[in-house]
Amino acid sequence: MIKKYLYLLLALPLVALSFQSCIKDDSYGPSGNSSKLSLAQDLQEKYTLNRWDTLKISPNVVQTNEQKKVDYEWEVNGKVVSTDASLKYVCKDFGSFPCRLKVSNGDNIQYYEFGLNVQYSYVDGLYILASNSGKTIVSYLPEEGSTKTFDLDVLQKNNPSIDFTGEPKGIDYALARDNKTPLLFVAVGNPSTIYEFDGNLMNMRFTTNSTGDVTYLRKSALTYPKSMLTMVNHVPNRLTLSETSLFNLGRSIKDGLGSDISLADAATAWKQQDLRYVQGYVMFDNAEGRLVAQKVQATGKVPVELLKGKFTGETLVGMGPVDNERNIVLLTWNATSSKFKCYYIFPGFYPSTATKVEAAVVKDEAVVPATAGLTTQSVVRVSAEKNLVYYSAGNKLYAYNVLSGGNFPQSALTTFGDAGETIADMLILEGSNKLYVATNAASGQLVGSIYCFDMNENKLLWAKKNITGRIKNITYRQ
């Protein structure tokens, strides 16, 4: 019995050796058909793309022996997203995700891990509000040299369940109350709906329904509460960020003036002389020709009307800040006298001490000659740093120095595009020498174009022709 067990123990190592030899022969011997898998070139450790870009990977799989059918399985964040040999994955979600490729051929299985970093798509660049096929769209145009890509419409892509049918009414960019989260506001239709979007993902956060037609939507000069200023049927309203109801500012203005108002689609803030605080902002009442003021950080009382009686019978063409926002400039039209006028104004200083109050003063005024090119349809933008007033006529751009004492231009500074194009909006980028100009062609499928003009060198930096629908407004996110 003991001998029997000894023979058995001695036989076990021989059986094991024989078993190992069979695996080795079958895998690597000349007559074996098992084929090991590998990649001819390693995958990247991490792939970085913008949201909505497509991750494309085409691995070259090598087999050691028989060329068998290879199965593929691509995983992103633990989910199988493709079983094709080449990966084409649309990066819909923002963030960093673990990824894995599994390849198998029946004999061998290999795993290859890599990372995917999806960045925000919409950062520095222009946001272009336009109409296209009966709907409001917002096109994103990144800065020159950016790795980001142009997108014709960021609204529908990121909010597929929302119907943006209707005319575009207004757009602007602001930081949320945390001073970090970027927000984009867009007004659509009549009666108008104001949408608040997350500026990074372009997902809708809040909607506000107005009772009338929004014709103006811009970031308010108010520091508290942080808000948007909007004109609803030419009456000013305040929309506090991330809230859904409009506060009518027109009631108190109407009570202060003693009559109805019809405000122009413009507002301009001014600062005290040391530039530390924003004293207030002004609007213009086209109903009777009045410069309407609202308090921001002034410690004293700001009159509801500045320079009473000075602008009777006039309507606003455009306004803006000069002297680094210490003063303002107005361009007006008087239909009775058929005259355009330019006013250079100090809006006043309103501290709590009555003896230190400085009333508003017209520092200079001049009749704008017919040869200067100004029209009632001119788009007007003002450089607070350069004291230059830029205004349009068709596709022509004019420039007037407020400090020149009435020395208006006799010819256009430059023109944009073809003769049939019309300047729809302009934007001066704060702290830079860039003037962005948006034009619309008379006809075509995509009529909207964008031009970038150097205000220092007075030359065109670049042009993007016919890239979007009919443009209403533009804004910039920095």
Model-derived features with residue positions:
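Solvent-exposed loop segments of extracellular immunoglobulin-like
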Residues: 63-73
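Hydrophobic/tyrosine-rich beta-strand signature of extracellular beta-sandwich/beta-rich modules
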Residues: 100-101
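Surface-exposed, flexible coil segments in extracellular/virion-facing regions
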Residues: 73-91
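An edge-strand/N-cap motif at the start of beta-rich repeat modules
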Residues: 115-145
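Acidic, serine/threonine- and glycine-rich low-complexity intrinsically disordered segments
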Residues: 201-395
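A short beta-strand segment in extracellular, disulfide-stabilized domains
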Residues: 48-65
